[in-house]
A protein has these predicted regions:
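Glycine-rich portal/gate segments that line the openings of hydrophobic small-molecule binding cavities
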Residues: 30, 40-87, 136-149
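Well-ordered beta-strand positions
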Residues: 11, 71-72, 97-98
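Beta-strand/loop substructures that line and gate deep hydrophobic ligand-binding cavities in soluble
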Residues: 81-136
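Hydrophobic pocket/interface hotspot
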Residues: 19-23, 29, 53, 70, ...
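Intrinsic-disorder/low-complexity, polar/charged segments enriched in Ser/Thr/Lys/Arg/Asp/Glu/Gln
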Residues: 3-11, 50-52, 65, 77, ...
Length: 149
């Protein structure tokens, strides 16, 4: 089985800074990102943002734990890479584009290699279901949170 990859893009009626700040507040991400069940911040960067985070996500077929390293380039970019966890490799990102007039285009992406064991559970139609579940929820969750004020 290959990598599970994909992106979801949404246009948000909120300024880029608000969208970035919500996505960068990793501590509170489980409140609006349904597949993310738990986070524990292990380290913070010089700005007080989460730098190293232990997460638990619902991947539909199994709870997946990962320790992720975050990097930030405000207001346009957030990246994370797995340092250790249940999948072989994981890279995720947010990209933000200022559309003007207080609107933002946000893109959420994932590229994960589930590895052999988890990969055996994610064959065929289950793979597409898991990818859609993991990707769709984050972008829509950010949109709802940012537009709520």
């Amino acid at each position: 089985m290959g990598n599970i990859r994909g992106e979801r893009t949404v246009d948000i009626d909120a300024p880029i800074e608000r969208c970035f700040d919500i996505a960068a507040d990793v501590d509170h991400a489980p409140e609006w990102q349904g597949s993310l069940k738990d986070v524990e911040v292990l380290e913070r960067d010089g700005e007080g943002r989460a730098a190293l985070v232990e997460t638990e996500s619902d991947a539909k077929v199994k709870a997946v734990r990962a320790t992720l390293r975050f990097t930030y380039a405000p207001p346009g970019q957030i990246d994370w890479h797995q340092e250790r966890g249940d999948v072989k490799s994981l890279h995720g990102w947010w990209r933000f584009e200022d559309l003007g007039e207080g609107r933002t285009r946000a893109t959420y992406g994932l590229d994960a290699d589930p590895g052999r064991m988890l990969g055996m559970l994610l064959r065929g139609p289950v793979e597409a279901t898991v990818r859609d579940f993991l990707l769709g929820n984050a972008a829509e969750g950010l949109k709802q949170r940012a537009e709520a004020g």
